[in-house]
A protein has these predicted regions:
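Conserved SAM/SAH-binding loop
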Residues: 2-10
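Glycine-rich phosphate/adenylate-binding loop
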Residues: 14-168
Length: 168
């Protein structure tokens, strides 16, 4: 477990290449940044990793299990969101000082962490064939208690994972 702050210039290759699996729960300075930085190094060294959800706008997100050259990578997800959110404009939020006013439901973070644990155990223990059965990121919708999954696909032309081979 590493409990240090990460800055843009922080060198992480030596930390990552010496492990078998990485769980990224860093949400500072921003989850998108930490996910991209860590995931690119993990893919380079063919290290499976999990980008956790369960906080802020990702409160009920399942997170992403990324197995290099098998599942969509962080860049595949970024491209997906760029396409899907191309014309999206945020609505003005009714609460002005959100950092003081808005909290989250603990049960949603519990959902995200429990889901992540199950997916991580399945991957590490080899309980499912990830070449055939893996789940992309999902969202638990509290209003109707449903679980929906994104339609992210591995991009064969991805600059990070496209064209690479996975070794079991």
């Amino acid at each position: 477990i590493i409990q240090e702050s990460m800055k843009p210039e922080t060198k992480i290759e030596n930390l990552i290449k010496s492990v078998d699996f990485v769980v990224n729960t860093m949400d500072e300075p921003y989850i998108g940044y930490t996910a991209a930085k860590i995931s690119r190094v993990c893919v380079k060294y063919k290290i499976a990793h999990y980008i956790a959800g369960g906080f802020d706008a990702h409160l009920s997100s399942t997170g992403e299990l990324i197995v290099p050259y098998v599942t969509p990578c962080v860049e595949c997800y970024a491209s997906h969101f760029k396409r899907k959110l191309k014309d999206w404009k945020p609505k003005k939020h009714p609460v002005k000082s959100r950092y003081k006013e808005i909290g989250g439901l603990a049960c949603l973070s519990l959902f995200s962490s429990s889901y992540a644990c199950i997916e991580i155990i399945k991957c590490i223990a080899g309980l499912v064939d990830l070449e055939d059965k893996y789940k992309v990121r999902g969202e638990f919708l509290f209003n109707d208690m449903s679980l929906t999954y994104l339609d992210v696909e591995k991009n064969p032309n991805c600059p990070i994972c496209g064209g690479g081979l996975h070794e079991s």
